[in-house]
Every structure is written in structure tokens, then in C-alpha cells.
UniProtKB/Swiss-Prot annotation:
The gene is rplC. Belongs to the universal ribosomal protein uL3 family. Keywords: Ribonucleoprotein, Ribosomal protein, RNA-binding, rRNA-binding. This is Large ribosomal subunit protein uL3. Signal peptide: none annotated.
């Protein structure tokens, strides 16, 4: 487990490789983040480092949040706090700055954020159901079809895919390639798209191995 960083999505653009290939990329303004808490196996039962990001006004923080930052000796007011599991928490100190220099070009990243909310959506848009016939007297155009059996079980099973609120949930896109790092402007240039709207908060971590290696 390795430390990540917090950032905000700036937008998408494209860059060109030395071979002349156009690469779609997302620009992320990441960090600098401040270490606001260090958790160890002895004190909390697990090892983790909490990072604070995005300076803000005092009115946007509760008294508990301001007290938490003051206890850590952090003078600036930070709006977003996130925790990252690490193997060696003793390698970090309270108030330490974490920048984009912890990453290197070519590295694979996992990027998590809140997906764009689409509001109430139907079966086709939300779950990609096929539609019914559009002519010959059909009245089943965009309906879901059967939602279960009859008297037995006499109910609709939980988890059945139906119309409802789409988007606005936490999404992680795995193994995105880091193309460039700009330490002077705190920018990460990531190949492909990342979740969320422009300006949305992102959690960026080194890619994790999920499942068994083949």
C-alpha cells in the first residue's frame, strides 16, 4: 500500500507523442497536500496517513474540523481530508507536504471520484436494456419487460435493475497511464478520462493489483 494524493479535475485535451499520435489526456491539478494525521497499528489498529487539501475560508469548516487541524499543528485551513493506507507511517511527519513528485511518468494510477449525476434515467439509458418493437401495434417500446414470476415468489427481488437515479456515485477507474508530471504547476497529465465534472475532487493512488496475477 502506497500513499496517494488529492486533486481536482481541470479538463480534457490532447497531446502528441514523438511518433505523431494524438493521445487524449485529462489534466489534473494535484496537491500540494498536507499530512494532517498519522495512524499506526499501536494507536488505531491499522497504518494510515490522512492528507488535507484545498485551502478554504474558516466559515466552510466546523469547529471540530478546525480543532482537528490545530491539533496536528497545521496552520492553513484545508477543506478536504482523505485517508490513505500505508505500510510505513513512520516515514511521514505532521505538516509534511505531499506533491506530484511522488509519481513518475509511465506509472499506472487508480483514479477515484464522484461520477457525473444524470438525474432520473430509464432502463435503456441507465442499464442499456434493448427496446421493444416500435411499430406493428406494439405498445412495449421502452418498458422493462418482466420483473419476476407470479404468485411465487409474489414479489420483486431486491437488486433488480430498474429506472432510477443515475450517476452521482463513487467510481474508480483503474490502471490509467500517467503521461507527464509538471511539478512547477502541480499538474498530472493522465491518459484517458477520469470520473466526475471539471473541478471535481479526485483521489489518485498507484495502481493496485486486484485478483490473482496470471
Amino acid at each position: 500500500m502506497a500513499l496517494g494524493i488529492l486533486g481536482r479535475k481541470v479538463g480534457m485535451t490532447q497531446i502528441f507523442s514523438p511518433e505523431g499520435l494524438a493521445i487524449p489526456v485529462t489534466v489534473v491539478q494535484a496537491g500540494p497536500c498536507t499530512v494532517t494525521q498519522i495512524k499506526t497499528q499501536a494507536t488505531d489498529g491499522y497504518n494510515a496517513v490522512q492528507l488535507g487539501y484545498w485551502p478554504t475560508a474558516e466559515k466552510h469548516l466546523t469547529r471540530a474540523q478546525r480543532g482537528h487541524l490545530s491539533k496536528a499543528g497545521v496552520t492553513e485551513l484545508l477543506r478536504h481530508l482523505r485517508e490513505f493506507r500505508v505500510d510505513q507511517p513512520e516515514a511521514y511527519q505532521l505538516g509534511q507536504k505531499i506533491t506530484v513528485e511522488i509519481f513518475s511518468p509511465g506509472q499506472l494510477l487508480d483514479v477515484a471520484g464522484t461520477s457525473i449525476g444524470r438525474g432520473f434515467a430509464g432502463y435503456q439509458k441507465r442499464h442499456h436494456f434493448g427496446r421493444g418493437p416500435m411499430s406493428h401495434g406494439s405498445k412495449n417500446h421502452r418498458r422493462p419487460g418482466s420483473v419476476g414470476a407470479g404468485t411465487t415468489p409474489g414479489r420483486v427481488f431486491p437488486g433488480l435493475r430498474m429506472a432510477g437515479r443515475m450517476g452521482g456515485c463513487r467510481v474508480t477507474i483503474r490502471k490509467l497511464q500517467l503521461v507527464q508530471v509538471d511539478p512547477e504547476r502541480n499538474l498530472l497529465i493522465i491518459k484517458g478520462s477520469v470520473p466526475g465534472v471539471e473541478g471535481g475532487l479526485l483521489e489518485i493512488t498507484p495502481a493496485k493489483q486486484v485478483g490473482n496475477k496470471r
